[in-house]
């Protein structure tokens, strides 16, 4: 029986850097290609939950340290012989909560996939609003080939990006594909050389941070929930969102800035 490894200090498994309203979160387990341990999920959970109390953050970039983004779940960090059903259930629920926090974050999230992204690691990236991926990165959702199952929401996030036919190919055949393929299929927004991924992701985050926060939040919410509504319900939801935006100071600022031919200064209210 393998003895469980001592827990990693939470402050070390996730790095934070905030600059000009952009919060960069770096998965920091490069010795394991950023495989996601329970400690890393816990830190992500707490940090993402704190965004509602950090009004200065206007966008988030999520990336990985070293040569990989994340190669998936790291249950070995806890000792293979020590895993029981209770631990597995807690781990899965925690992973699902983190993916939902990314999808429902109060600010947009850009995944900077700087290298390989597999399984739970790719699930994290798919939960983001936008994705920039290294052209040469290898991506895979291998669960059905391993006799396990995906649990991070890809049955929704993947077909929402690439359509049902391509999602079936990716999930049922469990093949590796490249970052260049991901961009060609619409899974990622851009494919760049690995050295350019973080800078390109930050550029997207800066563009997002310059948008009107209330309008941006309404757009993200509606895009996420639109597949569950009828066309008439979507029109009604858009009308309600439009009315809410019209009540904000940013609505007035946007119109004034347009007429004055200057960049708008939005305050999120």
Which residues does each PLM region occupy?
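Amphipathic alpha-helical segments at domain termini/boundaries
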Residues: 2-28, 32, 175-209, 217-229, ...
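Conserved CoA-thioester-binding segment of acyl-CoA-metabolizing enzymes
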Residues: 1-65, 100
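Hydrophobic alpha-helical membrane-association signature
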Residues: 40-43, 91-94, 124, 197, ...
